[in-house]
Amino acid sequence: AGMVAQPIAMDEQSLLSMIDRRVELANTDDANSSRLLLLILDGITDPRNLGACIRSAASMGVDAIIVPKDKSAPLNEAASKTASGGASLVPVVSVVNLARCIGQLQKRQVWVVGTLLETEQMLHQVDMQDNIAIVMGSEGKGIRQKTAKCCDFLVKIPMVNADLGFNVSVAAGIALYEVQKQRRY
């Protein structure tokens, strides 16, 4: 059996310091290269789904993944294996209070975009050129109401058969791709 990549843990204070540095950079330097992309996972309890989200995040250049301490999958071997090396590329930040953390992001010029099934605005209709945090919820329940209330935008991913829906890692990949598409192409 091969070695499983060790996940990078980062605390909330280190995350906020990193964001402060990046926002400062964006004001002086080439704004394109210093724009933030964060992924917030609200209530993802299956380690394999967590791992698959980490893999999608790593593929799409996410700077950090934020998860709540409670009701969140452990970053265990199953998660790391599913992440296929992505766990060593993207820090995972476990926070005590997700709503408060989102508020801290917003104070630092990060737009927070929540994904829901039942909302009017489509993912591609939001301008994602600035610092962005994408919020994904659990497949069963979606993002919590308290989390949704904190978001700057609530969007849905257009689907042909919406009653089937996507696995959360697939939905995360689509949302992150949309950010990169708007920024790069």
Kindly give the residue locations of the regions a language model identified.
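Active-site/ligand-binding-proximal alpha/beta "capping" segment
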Residues: V113-V168
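Acidic-enriched and Gly/Ser
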Residues: S14-L15
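Structured adenosyl-cofactor binding patch, chiefly the S-adenosyl-L-methionine
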Residues: G2, S59, A64, P74, ...
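Conserved beta/loop motifs at nucleotide-recognition and modification sites
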Residues: A9-M10
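RNA substrate-binding interface of SAM-dependent RNA methyltransferases
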Residues: A1-M3, D20-M122
